[in-house]
Amino acid sequence: MQVDLLSSAQSAHALHLFHQHSPLVHCMTNDVVQTFTANTLLALGASPAMVIETEEASQFAAIASALLINVGTLTQPRAQAMSAAVEQATRSQTPWTLDPVAVGALDYRRRFCVELLSHKPTAIRGNASEIMALAGVANGGRGVDTTDAAANAIPAAQTLARETGAIVVVTGEVDYVTDGHRIIGIHGGDPLMTKVVGTGCALSAVVAACCALPGDTLENIASACHWMKQAGERAVARSEGPGSFVPHFLDALWQLTQEVQA
């Protein structure tokens, strides 16, 4: 199994495209991470919108550059709104990304996410346990936390990618991005990133935005993982703990965009 690495030139090119196109991202995400997710997108140069009412969600999915479905705080009314948005995104050819939070531990959201797969997401982003559960390989995870190493989920990610046509991202100490054939590994980051709620969910929003960019979508999505890890490393170097990490992280994302514009 060959795992390719992303070059710094590829990452910089994708970030230039990101800043140039400034995708409008319709984030149907969980209540815990909305502010952090929106600020992450803004720091990188995208435009976030958090539209959740069913009628509006369907309408906005046709306007947005990309749609994110994150099931972290799933309810039945929210599931109805998400389904409506995904159906409209499919009709409008709006790329959409699924973040199947905790599907390995909870049956209702697993069934819901499996139903959504019939609408062919452009990308799927989850930890190893979530990706393996969604692929039907195993049930597991400790709520939103993974109990599996990312590398162990590569075969499941490849299978899921081939079956759905999505680019699948497995995040962990090393992130792996695959279209079912090619695999790109992204190293970096810091364990402190797991002590701040929302870094994975925010990455899913950035992945969604990258699905709207021209060029090689696999490389663009892998670049999203690289930006987040790179910003995390910079933020940790300036932080004293989780509380001071978040503002430094947002600053680091902003600085990355300024560097590619220089």
Curated annotation (Swiss-Prot):
<keyword id="KW-0808">Transferase</keyword>
<feature type="binding site">
    <location>
        <position position="171"/>
    </location>
    <ligand>
        <name>ATP</name>
    </ligand>
</feature>
<comment type="function">
    <text>Catalyzes the phosphorylation of the hydroxyl group of 4-methyl-5-beta-hydroxyethylthiazole (THZ).</text>
</comment>
<comment type="similarity">
    <text>Belongs to the Thz kinase family.</text>
</comment>
<dbReference type="InterPro" id="IPR000417">
    <property type="entry name" value="Hyethyz_kinase"/>
</dbReference>
<feature type="binding site">
    <location>
        <position position="125"/>
    </location>
    <ligand>
        <name>ATP</name>
    </ligand>
</feature>
<dbReference type="Pfam" id="PF02110">
    <property type="entry name" value="HK"/>
</dbReference>
<comment type="pathway">
    <text>Cofactor biosynthesis; thiamine diphosphate biosynthesis; 4-methyl-5-(2-phosphoethyl)-thiazole from 5-(2-hydroxyethyl)-4-methylthiazole: step 1/1.</text>
</comment>
<dbReference type="GO" id="GO:0009229">
    <property type="term" value="P:thiamine diphosphate biosynthetic process"/>
</dbReference>
<dbReference type="GO" id="GO:0000287">
    <property type="term" value="F:magnesium ion binding"/>
</dbReference>
<protein>
    <recommendedName>
        <fullName>Hydroxyethylthiazole kinase</fullName>
        <ecNumber>2.7.1.50</ecNumber>
    </recommendedName>
</protein>
<feature type="binding site">
    <location>
        <position position="198"/>
    </location>
    <ligand>
        <name>substrate</name>
    </ligand>
</feature>
<dbReference type="GO" id="GO:0005524">
    <property type="term" value="F:ATP binding"/>
</dbReference>
<feature type="binding site">
    <location>
        <position position="50"/>
    </location>
    <ligand>
        <name>substrate</name>
    </ligand>
</feature>
<keyword id="KW-0784">Thiamine biosynthesis</keyword>
<keyword id="KW-0460">Magnesium</keyword>
<keyword id="KW-0067">ATP-binding</keyword>
<dbReference type="GO" id="GO:0004417">
    <property type="term" value="F:hydroxyethylthiazole kinase activity"/>
</dbReference>
<dbReference type="InterPro" id="IPR029056">
    <property type="entry name" value="Ribokinase-like"/>
</dbReference>
<dbReference type="GO" id="GO:0009228">
    <property type="term" value="P:thiamine biosynthetic process"/>
</dbReference>
<keyword id="KW-0418">Kinase</keyword>
<keyword id="KW-0547">Nucleotide-binding</keyword>
<keyword id="KW-0479">Metal-binding</keyword>
